[in-house]
Amino acid sequence: MSRMRAVCDARILVIDDEPANLALAAAVLSREGYSNIETVPDPRQAIERYLAFRPDLVLLDLMMPGIDGYALLDRLGRLAVADDPVPIMVLTADTSIEARRRALALGARDIVTKPFDVFEFGLRVANLIELRLLLGRLHQAGKAGTVTGEDSPAG
């Protein structure tokens, strides 16, 4: 399977309480070639949908009524298997440095502020998925015993 095909086959979970934001994210992702997109309009269902869908990438809005987006970010991050973490991209209208620091400290791999540039958004999504796929292959190679430090140049 080609690298681009593998990236486009990735499962993407989008969590946002705003239907317009879900529609925009799904439309941009579809235009970029992704077809396995699950949207979650009710953040209270996010954990259940995450466990059932087993995404390769999560796009998470932080500012949702009735739920602490940071707590959800932390919980999603803790659900990921330590040797196979699912990257989480935070989508937020909060441009403060405090919000960015807090999200990164809780495990977000990227932060995109709304409104976002669709071209940049597509590149960031592809980069995170490609990184996840590469780390997964590295992990599998390590389990198979094909990755060792012996290939390193002598220092």
What are these regions (language model features)?
Residues M1-L13, A26, I129-G155:
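Non-catalytic signal-transmission and effector/linker regions of two-component phosphorelay proteins
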Residues D16, D61, T92:
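Active-site residues of response regulator receiver
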Residues P19-E38:
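Two-component/phosphorelay signaling modules centered on CheY-like receiver
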Residues A20, P41-Q45, M63, D68-D74:
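Acidic catalytic/metal-coordinating carboxylates
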Residues A23-A27, A71, D84, T95-D110:
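Alpha4 helix (beta4-alpha4-beta5 surface) of REC/receiver domains from two-component response regulators
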Residues T39, P65-G66, Y70, T92, ...:
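The feature encodes the CheY-like receiver
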Residues E48, Y70-D83:
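Short amphipathic alpha-helix used as the core "switch/output" element in two-component signaling
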Residues E98, F116-V125, I129, L133:
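C-terminal output helix
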